[in-house]
Amino acid sequence: MSYSELYTRYTRVWIPDPDEVWRSAELTKDYKEGDKSLQLRLEDDTILEYPVDVQNNQVPFLRNPDILVGENDLTALSHLHEPAVLHNLKVRFLESNHIYTYCGIVLVAINPYEQLPIYGQDVIYAYSGQNMGDMDPHIFAVAEEAYKQMARDEKNQSIIVSGESGAGKTVSAKYAMRYFATVGGSASDTNIEEKVLASSPIMEAIGNAKTTRNDNSSRFGKFIEIGFDKKYHIIGANMRTYLLEKSRVVFQADDERNYHIFYQLCAAASLPEFKELALTCAEDFFYTAHGGNTTIEGVNDADDFEKTRQALTLLGVRDSHQISIFKIIASILHLGSVEIQSERDGDSCSISPQDEHLSNFCSLLGIEHSQMEHWLCHRKLVTTSETYVKTMSLQQVVNARDALAKHIYAQLFSWIVEHINKALHTSHKQHSFIGVLDIYGFETFEINSFEQFCINYANEKLQQQFNSHVFKLEQEEYMKEQIPWTLIDFYDNQPCIDLIEAKLGILDLLDEECKVPKGTDQNWAQKLYERHSNSQHFQKPRMSNTAFIVNHFADKVEYLSDGFLEKNRDTVYEEQINILKASKFPLVADLFHDDKDSAPATNTAKNRSSSKINVRSSRPLIKVPNKEHKKSVGYQFRTSLNLLMETLNATTPHYVRCIKPNDEKLPFHFDPKRAVQQLRACGVLETIRISAAGYPSRWTYHDFFNRYRVLMKKRELTNTDKKNICKSVLESLIKDPDKFQFGRTKIFFRAGQVAYLEKLRADKFREATIMIQKSVRGWLQRVKYRRLRAATLSLQRFCRGYLARRLAEHLRRTRAAIVFQKQYRMLKARRAYRRVCRATVIIQSFTRAMFVRRNYRQVLMEHKATIIQKYARGWMARKRFLRERDAAIVIQCAFRRLKARQELKALKIEARSAEHLKRLNVGMENKVVQLQRKIDDQNKEFKTLSEQLSAVTSSHAVEVEKLKKELAHYQQNQEADTSLQLQEEVQSLRTELQKAHSERRVLEDAHNKENGELRKRVADLEHENALLKDEKEYLNNQILCQSKAESSQSSVEENLLMKKELEEERSRYQNLVKEYSQLEQRYENLRDEQTPGHRKNPSNQSSLESDSNYPSISTSEIGDTEDALQQVEEIGIEKAAMDMTVFLKLQKRVRELEQERKKLQAQLEKGQQDSKKGQVEQQNNGLDVDQDADIAYNSLKRQELESENKKLKNDLNELRKAVADQAMQDNSTHSSPDSYSLLLNQLKLANEELEVRKEEVLILRTQIMNADQRRLSGKNMEPNINARTSWPNSEKHVDQEDAIEAYHGVCQTNRLLEAQLQAQSLEHEEEVEHLKAQVEALKEEMDKQQQTFCQTLLLSPEAQVEFGVQQEISRLTNENLDFKELVEKLEKNERKLKKQLKIYMKKVQDLEAAQALAQSDRRHHELTRQVTVQRKEKDFQGMLEYHKEDEALLIRNLVTDLKPQMLSGTVPCLPAYILYMCIRHADYTNDDLKVHSLLSSTINGIKKVLKKHNDDFEMTSFWLSNTCRFLHCLKQYSGDEGFMTQNTAKQNEHCLKNFDLTEYRQVLSDLSIQIYQQLIKIAEGLLQPMIVSAMLENESIQGLSGVRPTGYRKRSSSMVDGENSYCLEAIVRQMNSFHTVLCDQGLDPEIILQVFKQLFYMINAVTLNNLLLRKDACSWSTGMQLRYNISQLEEWLRGKNLHQSGAVQTMEPLIQAAQLLQLKKKTHEDAEAICSLCTSLSTQQIVKILNLYTPLNEFEERVTVSFIRTIQAQLQERNDPQQLLLDSKHVFPVLFPYNPSALTMDSIHIPACLNLEFLNEV
């Protein structure tokens, strides 16, 4: 692209500036080929002519578009050069207060000189697990990337932190280690991560000091390796140190301090344990007062000293060793304050023996005072022949003293580092490590010495490694994207490194000069000039012979050679060291032992083949004989540096470059000169240059398409392949193919191409804007013209109207005057006429009144005479009538008396006649015959019993004879003893016999009572069946009455449909009746098998109980019931009562089925009400049809029951035959065939009597019903009961007592029917109300569906289809669940009945065995009737009994192995109810051990299940609901009145009686809290990966968000259709899943509200925290997306009726943040509006969002710094917390409100799927 295209008018450029380094300017005219200068306008409107040289490429740098300014990654800039980098850093640092910025793989960190709230635990958790490009730049992001790559690639990592002093290296390294300690906590209880963090305050105390540039400057370099195991938990650490600045111990520059530990120890000198140190304030010691100021503003040395001691204790340093360390440090201070006196000759010195500091020094180190006093002032010279002791001058003594002090401190420093490594050492196997390197950055001062030389040498090595790594990454990126690449030329500093470390390099020559006896710094400098004068990286200064210049990668540095040799030798006199070795303190002697070198060095390299952390000494282990042969400092540093580079090359490096913004330590003050100097020195610009040499700008096809689709043509957009679209667009826009490359997933651009595309995009928008403005202005002018024209027409219209109205007014006035005159004349004439007329009328009225009064008086007189005549005639007529009536009455009385006497006489004669008696006797013939038959039967039975008695008597006689014989035999042997024994035995037998008789009487009384109760129960069942019959008839009549007004055609169709449904319902009902009959028959068969005998009914038993024609209980069934009652008396009360319980349960099942039919009938009634009304004729036809259908239905059902009854009888007879055959076989083996045949005969006779009784019942019922009808229809029947009654059977008169009894029964029946009718009317009214409620519910459902339909219409077609499918799935799922529940219910009943059948079959077998045993026993004993102990059958009391050995099985089946799916369709929280019923039985039996064991096992089992399924939401919610319900049950039935207010009387019976389980309730409450927290944790774990993508990144409103370049750090979700991409519907679906599970499990609604409140808080916290940490998310479009997403979540809450949970209130900070992104941010009023609106956001959060606010296009504006300052000023009064991020781990305290259950324990049924057959219902 030519310069004329780039440098056009309005193009902005950068030009050099001496003050600001670079300055922005704008072209005022286009550049043309051949121009020698550019016309520029500066920002202050100054015009400047800037010279250019196009041939030599001397043109100003182009400025990036504003849309790219402030980017997180410098490589995202289109124009990559120094001014662009500097400006971007400045804007982010000053305007947005962002101290971190990416530059490719480098994190640039600018020291803010202010504590920022961005390093808390919440920020660590926010960055944990995130990709490096997903969040704003941060040191935590680099640490997370290293941690993630270590786990993913299984390769060691390293973080290299560099920068000059005061740039923040140590703080950055400390935060990185804190991140690793938090995220990768130790796997055991060793708390190794705390020890790693504890090493920081120790190293800062002994290795950091205050300098002019930094108050906490690290004066050494360190490399910390943090070891991890296979699970990536911290297991240990190791530290290596480099180049401690020992000279600071004895010398500090002005306004600097010594190491912190000296001042900390002086600040704590007043403590009792430090009295022996003899310390005072720091100003009193020479080594601490050198710099002048001994304090640091804002730092408390005493508090820091306490932190140092705590850290030493945590690392395992004993108190004795700590005291020894502090003694050594104090001795150094005393040594520096020793006063040295010079002698007169000047060649010798002396120290006063009374010197207090020297005494303290010797006593603290445990050495001899005299020896140290002597050798501080003397030295030993050793020659080949002899040894000399020589005095030293004052300067030599001072130097020797300072060298000793430095050496002591260096040795102590090395010992502490070694001890820290031992404390951080671990025996576990190390899998990988992450190293953190904190080392000096490049340094250049006015005077540079040996320390700066070593530091810059290390930075040269690090820069070389950095360059090669960056180059390698660039090549890998190009190869991965499959684009051609050429070798990128980058700066290689290997020649400079060779100059320093190669053979005969600077360090070799320095070591060689140190070995020369009289070597000097000047000689060494001369050797350098001679050897390296031709090197391009070495220069000799012009004005000096003792300095040299090295051309480093960052800058040229001039080093002064003075002191190089001495610092490299690091000489300490051996005599002084020997004195220290002889110390009486072990620690002091150990510091200077022979196997340790005197010079400090770094740790040696670890064995790389071993995976463990090897702790080795920081000094070489080579024993040297004397000081001349020890290794120099330069050699040691070079060796340790090479080992460090080997370590770094074996790891994946991550770079952090720390920048110092200014030298004054001012917060958020940016000095461009200092910043540029450091950017050049740290290699950031080199990174930019390497990136710019290739393809620095990289876009995915998806992002490029979204950003630049405005540049595409319509025909290009028809292509579905975005990749081809991007290729065709780029080829048309950028002509030079070398300016871009198409990769596999990305498009690569040369530098400046993105800016060119942005310019084209802006031009496109500008053209569109002009077009829009043109159209709008034209429209406005047209509107203005139309408005003016309309106004003109309106004025004309009003003027013309005014003139017309004035003319009309004149005409109206003229006409009015004429009318007025006419009316006045007419009025005058009318008044005269009225006067004459009025006088005439008055005269006429008076005359007419006189004549009228005269006529009235005459009429009045005539009327009075007529009244007198009327009353006289009436009196005469009444007198005549009374006389005639009295005479007629006398005649009637006489005649009636005569007729009555005649009739009485005839009746008396008839009563005495024989014919009447015959007629009376005919009615009794049947009864006489029946009584005769009964007498015959009784005679037969008596005969049979007599035979049995004779047989028994004969057998008894035989036994008596046998006994007599035995008695005679016994008498012969033992006459006296035997007689006594027999008498006693007879007496005991008699006693037992009497006792048995008394028990029999008691049992007979109980039997009679139970028999009465059973009869009463049967009567109740008949009554209930009658109610159901009447209700059915009433409903049928009501259905017919309500369909009177239906239309003819629709009525016929609806009636046919309803009839069909009715027939189906009837068929289903008949099938159920049939099933009931079959089950009843089975019961009868089993009962007959158990019955050993049968007793006949009494003949006079009343049979009115069976007077019913109800379909559910027929006459045959009543007969069966009577049989059952008789069998109760025969087979034993206990067994019969158990069987009758089954019968009553079956009757209960029939009632349930009848209720179900009733519900179906109600639904049928509703359907018929909705049908249209028909005509009267067809209505009558429909009525007849329904009545016929009902009659047919009743007859069909009656016939079916009769046939079923016959079938049952046949089956019963066959079963009896089979039993008889079996019994015959069994009895033949027992030699007793007669007894069982006798029982069969009795059974046969009982059946015959039963048939006779049935016929009598039918005859009597027919007579009663006909008599009742006759009585109601008769008109002449007299109420006298003594009169002759005409019965239906006139030939056979019925007894008077029977008739009276029948009459009373009919009256009672009528009253019962009236009561039923009233009850049915009430039930009908309730049913109508229920139907109305259903109609209202259906209306609400229809409204909701209409709303849903309206919302669906707003969605896209694909979304509509998906929504429709979801709705259909939900509907089908609900129907499926209903059907499943019905099927399971029926299966459960079937299984239950089968199980009972098996149980009774087993009981029958046991009974037969017992009877056989009893028969064998009766052979040897006297014949007595078997008496069974009665057990009164009770209802289920809601208790479950189990054996102690079944407790483990109960817990396994009910808790540990239970799956929630097994209980779908049953009562919610069923396990809780079952457990309580077990607890209740244990309480009932007062078994405290059983209660304790069961509760403990239950709690432990629940914990075990939750531990096993710690990530299963359904299982956790299932046990949360069951635990809460169990807790509620323990409260509800505890007996505490406070919990029993809502109980029913039945529930109060189920309360615990013996135990107070308050403590267990507390344990269950705690367990519920734990389960709730686990539930929240699981739900958060499922939701958290979706939140950021769904709430911030996904485009809920399509096309709203824009795309901006992201640079080297690509966002993980920027790729289209990414694996981790979620939409809002995913969250809603997950929420629906949660809500469905919680509701299905029966969890309390209050807890459900709390769950979703917690989840919505988590959504709010995670979203807001990400918003606060992501610059790309803070835009107007993101605010719109957020508001839409929040509204959708609120709508979901309302739809689920969860809006009262407070979840919306928890979202308030996020709502306000979204509103803040959309509000206007310019004026003072805007600031006030923001402050009043954002009440839930803290000041820091508001300012952070405003700083992060980023426009997505050129037409938006950034938030100005002044506006942010205004916001801060207005929010100063707020007392907000200092925390920036919300605590996403915060959990609201959960409340479990008391929620009693409405269910009673006896209504709970246990499904067979639980396999709890061992539980017995009590």
Curated annotation (Swiss-Prot):
Family the UniProt entry places it in: Belongs to the TRAFAC class myosin-kinesin ATPase superfamily. Myosin family.
Chain ranges of the IQ domain: 765-794, 788-817, 813-842, 836-865, 861-890, 884-913
Record-annotated Dilute domain positions: 1496-1773
The protein's name: Unconventional myosin-Vb
Function of the protein: May be involved in vesicular trafficking via its association with the CART complex. The CART complex is necessary for efficient transferrin receptor recycling but not for EGFR degradation. Required in a complex with RAB11A and RAB11FIP2 for the transport of NPC1L1 to the plasma membrane. Together with RAB11A participates in CFTR trafficking to the plasma membrane and TF (transferrin) recycling in nonpolarized cells. Together with RAB11A and RAB8A participates in epithelial cell polarization. Together with RAB25 regulates transcytosis.
Positions annotated to bind ATP: 163-170
Domain Myosin motor, residue spans: 69-762
Keywords on record: Actin-binding, ATP-binding, Calmodulin-binding, Coiled coil, Cytoplasm, Motor protein, Myosin, Nucleotide-binding, Phosphoprotein, Protein transport, Repeat, Transport
Gene expressing this chain: Myo5b
Residue span(s) of domain Myosin N-terminal SH3-like: 8-60
Modified residues (Phosphoserine): 1416
Annotated coiled-coil segments of the chain: 1140-1261, 1313-1415
Polar residues bias spans: 1098-1118
Subcellular location: Cytoplasm
Species annotation: Mus musculus (Mouse)
Pfam families: DIL, IQ, Myosin_head
Superkingdom of the organism of origin: Eukaryota
InterPro entries the UniProt entry points to: Dilute_dom, IQ_motif_EF-hand-BS, Kinesin_motor_dom_sf, Myo5b_CBD, Myosin_head_motor_dom-like, Myosin_N, MYSc_Myo5, P-loop_NTPase
Annotated SMART domains: DIL, IQ, MYSc
CDD domains, alphabetized: Myo5b_CBD (cd15477), MYSc_Myo5 (cd01380)
Quaternary assembly: Component of the CART complex, at least composed of ACTN4, HGS/HRS, MYO5B and TRIM3. Interacts with RAB11FIP2. Interacts with RAB11A and RAB8A. Found in a complex with CFTR and RAB11A. Interacts with NPC1L1. Interacts with LIMA1.
Stretches for region Requires for interaction with LIMA1: 21-40
Location of region: Actin-binding: 641-663
One GO CC annotation: Schaffer collateral - CA1 synapse
